[in-house]
Amino acid sequence: MALERSDVEKIAHLARLGLSEADLPRTTETLNNILGLIDQMQAVDTSGVEPLAHPLEATQRLRPDAVTETDHRDAYQTIAPAVEEGLYLVPKVIE
């Protein structure tokens, strides 16, 4: 499936991208190359290949889930401009 110039213009509009007239041919070619690579990968026969999440059978050593630091909330909130009941107060952004 090859993209046309109009397809790239529509995609750019939907993505809120400003592409100049000079950028459109190069962007169209780049996107078509990417789609061509995806087509090549989809054409590979992977039947009989076991799906895997990690190529190595390795496990990570995890530390115990225990509190290792003391609570510093009060010290951190002393420099905050506004605090109420242990929560930081911030200006309203969305009405």
From Swiss-Prot:
Enzyme superclass (EC): ligase
A GO MF term: ATP binding
Gene name of the encoded protein: gatC
Catalytic reaction list: L-glutamyl-tRNA(Gln) + L-glutamine + ATP + H2O = L-glutaminyl-tRNA(Gln) + L-glutamate + ADP + phosphate + H(+); L-aspartyl-tRNA(Asn) + L-glutamine + ATP + H2O = L-asparaginyl-tRNA(Asn) + L-glutamate + ADP + phosphate + 2 H(+)
Function comment: Allows the formation of correctly charged Asn-tRNA(Asn) or Gln-tRNA(Gln) through the transamidation of misacylated Asp-tRNA(Asn) or Glu-tRNA(Gln) in organisms which lack either or both of asparaginyl-tRNA or glutaminyl-tRNA synthetases. The reaction takes place in the presence of glutamine and ATP through an activated phospho-Asp-tRNA(Asn) or phospho-Glu-tRNA(Gln).
Keyword vocabulary terms for this entry: ATP-binding, Ligase, Nucleotide-binding, Protein biosynthesis
NCBIfam families attached to this UniProt entry: gatC
Superkingdom of source: Bacteria
Source species taxonomy: Bacteria, Pseudomonadati, Pseudomonadota, Gammaproteobacteria, Pseudomonadales
Enzyme Commission no: 6.3.5.-
Native source species: Pseudomonas paraeruginosa (strain DSM 24068 / PA7) (Pseudomonas aeruginosa (strain PA7))
UniProt entry tagged with the keyword Protein biosynthesis: yes
Family: Belongs to the GatC family.
Protein's UniProt name: Aspartyl/glutamyl-tRNA(Asn/Gln) amidotransferase subunit C
Keyword Ribosomal protein: no
